[in-house]
């Protein structure tokens, strides 16, 4: 706000760490952005990847007024592995913002939807709930397997239990290595190049 911020990008769950934002946290973000007239772009593409007691709360559900200064992005690409169909959903409740968006898309000629992608998107959202449940169970079972593997074979390395997403994060602090030593060990012994 001090730097004349015009837009805030909110990723929920937060990629790449998998944090699932709680309602009070979303409310705090929303109120700050509303007060300072900041446009919020809400990336909810990973909304289905939530585990345990964590719940994905759509930004629009936190407060009806947030629809006036936000744009929500979703897609079937992550949950249903449909990225190749290049289909996504852009939800713009504010008519003025939607008009600006539509005019911009028309000007650049990127407003033609992928017909096959639309059918796949509708089918995924309307008929594949069982598949989503089974996929989430499978992904979470992978976390459990990896966690057990670490406990049995590398007890100084711990899985950071995810709230959401499908990425594994591991905690190396108990290994007693500084950053440079850890990077060298990962490269030379594990064959893993760190970015």
Role assignments for model-derived ranges:
Residues 1-52:
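Active-site phosphate-binding strand-loop segment of PLP-dependent enzymes
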Residues 64, 68-140, 147-148, 152:
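Conserved core segment of the aminotransferase class I/II
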Residues 35-36, 66, 190:
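Helix C-cap/helix->beta junction micro-motif
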Residues 41, 71-73, 160, 193-195:
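Structural detector of well-ordered beta-strand residues that form the stable sheet scaffold
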Residues 122, 137-147, 159-172:
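Conserved glycine-rich beta-strand-loop-beta hairpin in the small C-terminal domain of fold type I
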Residues 33, 63, 150, 186-187:
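A generic structural signal for well-ordered alpha-helical segments
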Residues 157-158, 170-195:
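Conserved C-terminal alpha-helix-loop-beta "cap" of PLP-dependent enzymes
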């Amino acid at each position: 706000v001090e730097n004349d911020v015009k837009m805030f990008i909110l990723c929920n769950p937060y990629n790449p760490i998998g944090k699932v934002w709680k309602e009070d946290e979303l409310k705090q973000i929303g109120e700050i952005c509303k007060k300072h007239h900041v446009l919020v772009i809400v990336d909810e593409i990973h909304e289905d990847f939530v585990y345990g007691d964590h719940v994905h709360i759509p930004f629009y559900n936190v407060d009806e007024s947030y629809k006036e200064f936000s744009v929500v992005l979703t897609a079937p690409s992550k949950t249903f592995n449909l990225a190749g169909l290049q289909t996504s959903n852009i939800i713009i409740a504010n008519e003025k913002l939607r008009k600006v968006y539509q005019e911009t898309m028309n000007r650049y000629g990127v407003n033609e939807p992928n017909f096959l992608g639309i059918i796949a998107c509708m089918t995924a959202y309307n008929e594949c709930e069982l598949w989503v449940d089974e996929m989430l169970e499978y992904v979470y079972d992978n976390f459990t397997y990896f966690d057990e593997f670490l406990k049995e074979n590398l007890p100084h390395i711990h899985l950071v239990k995810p709230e959401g997403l499908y990425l594994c994060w591991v905690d190396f602090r108990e290994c007693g290595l500084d950053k440079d030593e850890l990077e060298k060990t990962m490269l030379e012994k594990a064959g893993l190049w760190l970015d």
